[in-house]
Amino acid sequence: MYGNWGRFLRVNLSTGEVKVEEYGEELAKKWLGSRGLAIYLLLKEMDPKADPLGPENKLIITPGPLTGTSAPTGGRYNVVTKSPQTGFITMANSGGYFGAELKFAGWDAIVVEGQSEKPVYIYIKDDHVEIRDASHLWGKVVSETEAAIKKEIGSNKLHIASIGPAGENLVKFAAIMNDGHRAAGRAGVGAVMGSKKLKAIAVEGSKRVPIADKQKFMLVVREKINKLRNDPVAGGGLPKYGTAVLVNIINENGLYPTRNFQTGVFEHAYEQSGEAMTAKYLIRNQPCYACPIGCGRVNKLPTLGVTEGPEYESIWALGANLGINDLASIIEANHQCDEFGLDTISTGGTLAAAMELYEKGYLTDDELGDAPPFRWGNTEVLHYYIEKIAYRKDLGDKLAEGSYRFAEMYGHPEFSMSVKKLELPAYDPRGAEGHGLGYATNNRGGCHIKNYMISPEILGYPYKMDPHDISDEKVKMLILFQDLSALIDAAGLCLFTTFGLGADDYRDMLNAALGWDFSTEDYLKIGERIWNAERLFNLKAGLDPAKDETLPKRFLEEPMPEGPNKGHVVRLKEMLPRYYKLRGWTEDGRIPREKAEELGIAEFL
């Protein structure tokens, strides 16, 4: 087999048993790897109704067949599990170097089962695997954990994925961090890791990923890298300004969510833009493994020193969504979240819900006491409550449940800007209605990455579409983006490659690496299979499409108050039935047997 090793580790933390399991190329041709392999294993082995924080839940850490190769952005890995935040499937994706190192060690996945009675970490050096005591690491922040493990093992070549105090304390939106500041961030994967008392996974590998046709692969890769470098976004805006290049673009288009999505225009957007960050604080770019784009930022602040980030989503979540414009405070807060192991989007979204509850009088000074008041623009709220959330102290214990549960405690869940209890990212769907349909139908909830309709609706990739068009063409484009994202994740590449590359380009790289002769349609069918399999998991876990596949009332009933999208709402009810029909599902959003048989997943019905 090429690309994949055809084997994965199964680590049972209840028994301490470590097993090597193998699989054949037939399985790889059906699921490709990574996100695909993971959902196959979860459906085959796990009850979707299992407690996300119980021993029955599985945590699967998995690179793809192109991870660790020279394919552009071939450093990605996925963390797939049942989310404690949503109760459904989640697939958190991260870059850096950890995923590539896991492939260099000779593994396609680590399947973590059970729960340890005491803190542990997993040490992997090629075929050597140990479960080690981590009692001395419990309580440490991410940078301290990485430094301590490298010192203990005696190697600076290690790449480490770990949780901070937020994961240890089962914060519903705790992240898994790797290589310092790279995050598998969303929907509480860090809490699942913490529930298993697994502090970290440290990996060192010395193998080379097997390639079917090395010369052809090298030529294909060179061609794709050139396409990316010649693209105005992948080769221009992202390398120059990072993902924060989007701040001004999204604000000018009137969908930069401000003050908990009350409007889509922020008067201080430029002050927190990529252009402003580059001028004030940037030291250098920080690319992930094999990445020709290099969107990562390394900044230096007088108060903090050198740190990585923040990305566009983090700038917005810890900035405009809270009415905060001070970029230095945002960078400091992002650093805090990375060290504690918190998802910045959900952290900011939860604090924004608290601010609106405070603004409307439902959260009062009597409850806050001496704590900073939840006023829009108050930077003290950031630094004070981020730590409180990570350690579940005082009001932080309630905030650690996420915005939906927090707002529900005060009788007003409508102030949670979330889908399936996962906080929405930095695009108001009233300014991109196809993107809004993507939020509603995303398998992991309020996510932008897996259905990035901002590309056609705002940025013009692969071509410009009217953001307020809700035709079948728009719905079909969303379905293509969802299936393609599943394929790219399963391959082990970054979704930013879609700026410059199309489905045929992924086909070329995969065929050269794996030695297959698949068509573009064959690969997109794998993506469709993965998307449907994840939905099947959710349906078995209790997904009620009529109740769960919607948007916050604000987007459906409250017209955008200002800017280019003034007067618009999301016409979800007009799009959703057509989405189900074009997916080949029933009118109530379920997968019929004939569709499951077409995709080869009927065994899981």
Swiss-Prot record:
Pfam short name (any one): AFOR_N
Protein residues bound to tungstopterin: 76, 93, 95, 182-183, 185-186, 338, 342-343, 444, 450, 489, 493, 495
Root EC class: oxidoreductase
Entry-linked InterPro entries: Ald_Fedxn_OxRdtase_dom2 (IPR013984), Ald_Fedxn_OxRdtase_dom3 (IPR013985), Ald_Fedxn_OxRdtase_N (IPR013983), Ald_Fedxn_OxRdtase_N_sf (IPR036503), OxRdtase_Ald_Fedxn_C (IPR001203), Tungsten_al_ferr_oxy-like_C (IPR036021), W-dependent_AOR (IPR051919)
GO molecular function, one term: metal ion binding
Keywords linked to the UniProt accession: 4Fe-4S, Iron, Iron-sulfur, Metal-binding, Oxidoreductase, Tungsten
Known catalytic reactions: an aldehyde + 2 oxidized [2Fe-2S]-[ferredoxin] + H2O = a carboxylate + 2 reduced [2Fe-2S]-[ferredoxin] + 3 H(+)
Residues that bind [4Fe-4S] cluster: 288, 291, 295, 494
Annotated EC: 1.2.7.5
Cofactors (names): [4Fe-4S] cluster; tungstopterin
Cofactor note as given: Binds 1 [4Fe-4S] cluster per subunit.
Family: Belongs to the AOR/FOR family.
Oligomer and partners: Homodimer.
PANTHER family: ALDEHYDE FERREDOXIN OXIDOREDUCTASE (PTHR30038), TUNGSTEN-CONTAINING ALDEHYDE FERREDOXIN OXIDOREDUCTASE (PTHR30038:SF0)
Descriptive protein name: Tungsten-containing aldehyde ferredoxin oxidoreductase
